[in-house]
Amino acid sequence: MSILTSPLPHQKDALNEIIARANAYYAGTWRNLPIRPRWHSLVCGPTGVGKTALAMLAAEATNSSLLRISAPGWMPAGAHQRGTRESITVIAEHIAFHDRTIFVIDEMDKLMDSGAGSGSGGSSAGGSDSWRSYVRGEIYELADGRWPSGMRLPDDDHCNEISLDEITTKLRESVFILGVGTFQSWYDQTSSHRSMGFGAELDPCLPEMTADVVASRLPRELANRFNSDLIKLPDLQPSDYRQIALDAERQLPAELQESFRSEVSKRIDRAIDAKKGVRFLEECVMQALKNASMAQAVPCDPNLNF
């Protein structure tokens, strides 16, 4: 559920930067320059700060369509499964239908090998590493403005009217890629450095997880294909929690608003302490729906035997 209709204070700088990059990319004045910038960008930040919602606002501001694919659900070319389409086919079809596209690859950090936290791009054992390699390869080719070898256009009347050369031009000139991720394992590693021994105190002098720190830990192949200046969102502030709760309440049906407001008042302090982000709203909505359901339920006859 997206409850943002305008950016929160902590999101404004990041949103403005995404919009500026996307508009400059679409303008195309860079194409004839001897040095071509890397426009595709990475957005990072803790869970629940509105990274994906930010992409939706950016798409609206730049008159772009929004295509979002979650990296863990990416289906590589050739991995045919009944009822599941290859992600490349979905992307090609979307591009064929739209003039401009902001393409969000969500949970990019899930594509990292287990050893990639150090920036080495090391590999992990097991079959999942093979899947990650295929998906990373396809994403790298898209970021380079190429389709994976052997790709076929969707068997669709509209797509049959556009050639592979035309859809490649659109990929290179009208598709702005945003890689989104929490990179939570790096935050966890940083926050849990301890000296040897049980019960040791946390190190009070840990480095801050800035955008530069995250960028320095990216596998080189990934870093080479995206803008080196990562866009980082900070944690939600207490005032942000209250604002998004108010915005969410206004969008709910009238019969749920009072119960939702009550749940927010019970949970918001714990949500702020635990840094749950907008996820705490889901808990409040679920409890409000449960309350409504219980209020409408027909009481059970105590004389019934089961």
What residues fall within each predicted segment?
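Canonical AAA+ ATPase core
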Residues: 44, 53-56, 109-110, 115, ...
